[in-house]
Amino acid sequence: MAKLTAVPLSALVDEPVHIRVTGLTPFQVVCLQASLKDDKGNLFNSQAFYRASEVGEVDLERDSSLGGDYMGVHPMGLFWSMKPEKLLTRLVKRDVMNRPHKVHIKLCHPYFPVEGKVISSSLDSLILERWYVAPGVTRIHVKEGRIRGALFLPPGEGPFPGVIDLFGGAGGLFEFRASLLASHGFATLALAYWGYDDLPSRLEKVDLEYFEEGVEFLLRHPKVLGPGVGILSVCIGAEIGLSMAINLKQITATVLINGPNFVSSNPHVYRGKVFQPTPCSEEFVTTNALGLVEFYRTFEETADKDSKYCFPIEKAHGHFLFVVGEDDKNLNSKVHAKQAIAQLMKSGKKNWTLLSYPGAGHLIEPPYSPLCSASRMPFVIPSINWGGEVIPHAAAQEHSWKEIQKFLKQHLNPGFNSQL
């Protein structure tokens, strides 16, 4: 009798799962399916076909998928190859504290669609819990002064290295990365800056003094290890993160995921100074064959050619980790990172590391997250192409997440000796 097993049944989302099947007939072909519903009820699913060994077993750590949503030996392929049933939907975990993703794994006979319906009998099934928060992590709702967000603290007395987590142009408050970082020992502030609570409904300017308040708030907490803090940032959040690293002396480690090295669209304001956006070439905004907008060429005639538009990154005192998806269709991230590095090198600085991933897109998330290659965005019509190829993007997410943690611990905790 066929038996499906997975170890562990409950784990953090960035932890691998070992999936095996036993009790099959020799060389039997079976289908493995995975599905989950997000907090809004949107369905995501994947499937892969496997041939059993001569002893009737399938082991995803050893055996190659014959087809389906991926091919080859990929132990976590059922997770990162999931696709949304509703097109242009990004998998975002909103309730990180109380509910895990429940992933249904189903073992069944190979099936053939009949009149649009899937005809397949189940041989076995199980449910996995995938958490964004480890036991003992606490969440504190933050509404202090102008600051709005959520602070996640690891279990224990601390003090812990402090990190500010910044997302990009979607607005609102994203907590899933901060809660996961806290699960790995970082006191992490998920900081909203527009489209949340009583913050502005649209991002019209970047007030760096607001983010400075966020830094000071974090450093005041008794469980946060000073004297500096780190930044984990993506897209427009990375633009802000870079600006913070240059202007705020408390920033000692900055992770920039697919961000520009210049002011892209909204002016930055700090202590009376205004940093104006870089001119863009709207004629280079393109729409691909699927009707998705691509912005990555819009600064070809300005920032990509002339360093006068670039942030003076050489003035920063901290360290930088650039994470680049070379198939990013939203920003020319590889060019922007190389420009910033060239400025640092010209000033004789070696305070940078570059991770550049061929085939990875714009939205580089924690490990095993499904690739979101396109989605809807507030105030942007039509939808945006983020880029990325499924398998190399998944590899980039797994590798970069480990490197991000190493980098932050190295530069925020002087006594850290990498064991990752």
UniProtKB/Swiss-Prot annotation:
GO biological process terms, semicolon-separated: acyl-CoA metabolic process; animal organ regeneration; bile acid biosynthetic process; bile acid conjugation; bile acid metabolic process; fatty acid metabolic process; glycine metabolic process; liver development
Record PTM Phosphoserine, positions in chain: S125, S418
Modified residues (N6-succinyllysine): K40, K346, K350, K409
Entry similarity comment: Belongs to the C/M/P thioester hydrolase family.
Assembly notes: Monomer.
Tissue specificity remark: Expressed in liver (at protein level); found in hepatocytes, sinusoidal endothelial cells and Kupffer cells.
Domain of life: Eukaryota
Subcellular location: Peroxisome; Cytoplasm, Cytosol
Protein name: Bile acid-CoA:amino acid N-acyltransferase
Chief place of localization: other
Job of this protein: Catalyzes the amidation of bile acids (BAs) with the amino acids taurine and glycine. More efficient at taurine conjugation of cholyl CoA than glycine conjugation. Amidation of BAs in the liver with glycine or taurine prior to their excretion into bile is an important biochemical event in bile acid metabolism. This conjugation (or amidation) plays several important biological roles in that it promotes the secretion of BAs and cholesterol into bile and increases the detergent properties of BAs in the intestine, which facilitates lipid and vitamin absorption.
Signal peptide stretch: none
EC number(s) on file: 2.3.1.65, 3.1.2.27, 3.1.2.2
Family annotation (SUPFAM superfamilies): alpha/beta-Hydrolases
pH dependence remark: Optimum pH is 7.8.
GO CC terms: cytosol; peroxisome
Gene3D superfamilies: Acyl-CoA thioester hydrolase/BAAT N-terminal domain, alpha/beta hydrolase
Residue positions of the active site: C235, D328, H362
Catalyzed reactions: choloyl-CoA + glycine = glycocholate + CoA + H(+); hexadecanoyl-CoA + H2O = hexadecanoate + CoA + H(+); choloyl-CoA + H2O = cholate + CoA + H(+); chenodeoxycholoyl-CoA + H2O = chenodeoxycholate + CoA + H(+)
Gene Ontology molecular function, alphabetical: carboxylic ester hydrolase activity; choloyl-CoA hydrolase activity; fatty acyl-CoA hydrolase activity; glycine N-choloyltransferase activity; long-chain fatty acyl-CoA hydrolase activity; medium-chain fatty acyl-CoA hydrolase activity; N-acyltransferase activity; very long-chain fatty acyl-CoA hydrolase activity
Keywords, comma-separated and alphabetical: Acyltransferase, Cytoplasm, Fatty acid metabolism, Hydrolase, Lipid metabolism, Peroxisome, Phosphoprotein, Serine esterase, Transferase
InterPro entries assigned: AB_hydrolase_fold, Acyl-CoA_thioEstase_long-chain, BAAT_C, Thio_Ohase/aa_AcTrfase, Thio_Ohase/BAAT_N
